[in-house]
A protein has these predicted regions:
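Phosphate-binding loop of NTP-binding sites
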Residues: 96-154
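N-terminal leader/targeting and accessory segments in enzymes
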Residues: 1-100
Length: 154
């Protein structure tokens, strides 16, 4: 199972379906991992500050992860040994694929709803509330996700 998966592919979806239960969660945080879940382990950040969930691969395996998908580049010698476990699957450029992998695992919920993104420096919260309110008046239930929280507009 340790053959390199260079890009997201149908084979990765099939691998997840074969080795993880349908109710398994995908996580990069071992504190949230339960037996049977799938760990996504990869470095994130920039030159000044990096966080690397790959250091938790041994813990994920001991907690009973069904699979560990990990970024294989620049892996320490210790982790190279740990990742010989058949539950570990190297995925090149994993950080760039997490959104697609997660979306596919959850049957792409955003494909079945209208999503409106608001960008800019000022006024995003106000505009999001206005849009949600306008949609609600048309009997289109709306939720808002932003820096002030997330939820349905009453």
């Amino acid at each position: 199972m340790n053959a390199m998966l260079p890009t997201h592919s149908l084979s990765l979806d099939m691998l997840l379906a074969q080795h993880a239960n349908a109710d398994a969660q995908l996580t990069s945080d071992t504190r949230a991992l339960k037996p049977g879940d799938v760990m996504l382990a990869y470095p994130v950040g920039n030159v000044q500050q990096t966080s690397d969930s790959r250091i938790y691969i041994p813990q994920a395996l001991s907690l009973g992860a069904a699979l560990v998908l990990y970024e294989p580049s620049d892996l320490s010698e210790e982790l190279v040994e740990v990742c010989k476990d058949p539950r570990c699957v190297p995925v090149k450029d994993l950080a760039k694929q997490v959104g697609v992998i997660s979306g596919n695992w959850c049957q792409n919920p955003s494909h079945h709803m209208r999503v409106i993104g608001i960008t800019g420096t000022n006024g995003k919260t106000t505009v999001s509330q206005w849009i949600a309110s306008a949609l609600n008046t048309q009997n289109q239930p709306s939720a808002v996700v932003g820096t002030l929280g997330a939820g349905l507009l009453n």
